[in-house]
C-alpha cells in the first residue's frame, strides 16, 4: 500500500509523522506502532501531505486554515492541478522536499457572509476554488442581482453564478466557459451557469472587490456551494463574497509546475479530440 510506503520513507528520513485521526483509525492495522494522530493542527507542524486528488486537498485546507502550513498533494487518481505528485514519484518528491528543492505557490481563498445566520456556513465559510449559487429546483431559472463594491453590475437570469479564484478557474468555472487564470494573478472571475442571455459572458475582476448577490425566483430557496460543500439558503438572504484574509501555501516541485500541468491537460484534451476525428 502506498501509505505504508510513504510512512516508511518518512521514518527512514527521521521525519515525525502524524496522521489525521479518522484516517489513522482506518489504517492503523497497516502502520507501525509508533505513529501518532491529530484532530487539530497548530503552528508546530512543518508540512501537510494530502494523498488523493484535488478534492482531498480541499479537505486538507480545512485543517490548515490560517496556520500557513505548506501543503503538498500526492495524486492517487487522475491528473490534478493541486495534487500533482504521482504515486510512482513519491520517493523522489520526498527527497526534493526534505532537501528544500521546491517553491511555494500562495493561493488566494474567498469567503462568504450571509445577511441571515447559517450554522453550516459560519463554521466553515471559505473556499479555495469557487463559491457558486444555483437554483434548487431543476425546472426554473433564477435571477441573481449582482453588485460590485455596492454598485449594481447586472441581474443574471441563469441556472446559477460562479465566483471563482485563479485556482478554481480550471474547475467548474472553466466547464461553464470561464477563462483560465494564472494562480498568482490577483483576480476573481464571475461565470454565469447556462445563462438565458447568451451575451452574458464571464467577467474578470480585481480580487479586492466585494461581490454582493441577491437571488430571486419561483422557489423560496437556492443552493450555495463552497468547493464541495453545499447548503440551502432562503431568497431573503444577501450573500457577500470577498477575498479571505489568509492564503494557502502549496508546495511546487520544479518538474510539477502549473504550466507543465496545464500543458499536459491541454495535450490530453487535444489528443482526445484527434482520436475522435
Residue ranges with predicted function:
Residues 271-277:
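Conserved small/polar residues in nucleotide/adenosyl-binding loops
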Amino acid at each position: 500500500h502506498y501509505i505504508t510506503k510513504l510512512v516508511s520513507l518518512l521514518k527512514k528520513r527521521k521525519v515525525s509523522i502524524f496522521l489525521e485521526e479518522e484516517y489513522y483509525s482506518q489504517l492503523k492495522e497497516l502502520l507501525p506502532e509508533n505513529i501518532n494522530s491529530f484532530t487539530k493542527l497548530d503552528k508546530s507542524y512543518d508540512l501537510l501531505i494530502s494523498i488523493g486528488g484535488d478534492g482531498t486537498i480541499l479537505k486538507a485546507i480545512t485543517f490548515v486554515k490560517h496556520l500557513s502550513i505548506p501543503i503538498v498533494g500526492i495524486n492517487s487518481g487522475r491528473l490534478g492541478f493541486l495534487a500533482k505528485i504521482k504515486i510512482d514519484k513519491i520517493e523522489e518528491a520526498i527527497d526534493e522536499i526534505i532537501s528544500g528543492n521546491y517553491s511555494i505557490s500562495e493561493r488566494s481563498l474567498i469567503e462568504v457572509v450571509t445577511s441571515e445566520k447559517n450554522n453550516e456556513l459560519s463554521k466553515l465559510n471559505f473556499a479555495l476554488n469557487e463559491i457558486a449559487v444555483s437554483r434548487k429546483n431543476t425546472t426554473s431559472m433564477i435571477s441573481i442581482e449582482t453588485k460590485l463594491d455596492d454598485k449594481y453590475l447586472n441581474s443574471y437570469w441563469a441556472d446559477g453564478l460562479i465566483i471563482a479564484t485563479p485556482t478554481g478557474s480550471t474547475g467548474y468555472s472553466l466547464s461553464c466557459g470561464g477563462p483560465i487564470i494564472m494562480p498568482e494573478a490577483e483576480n476573481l472571475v464571475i461565470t454565469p451557469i447556462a445563462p438565458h442571455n447568451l451575451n452574458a459572458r464571464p467577467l474578470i475582476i480585481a480580487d479586492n472587490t466585494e461581490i454582493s448577490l441577491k437571488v430571486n425566483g419561483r422557489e423560496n430557496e437556492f443552493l450555495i456551494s463552497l468547493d464541495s460543500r453545499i447548503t440551502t439558503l432562503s431568497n431573503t438572504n444577501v450573500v457577500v463574497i470577498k477575498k479571505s484574509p489568509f492564503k494557502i501555501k502549496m508546495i511546487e516541485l520544479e518538474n510539477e509546475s502549473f504550466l507543465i500541468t496545464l500543458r499536459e491537460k491541454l495535450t490530453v484534451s487535444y489528443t482526445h479530440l484527434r482520436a475522435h476525428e
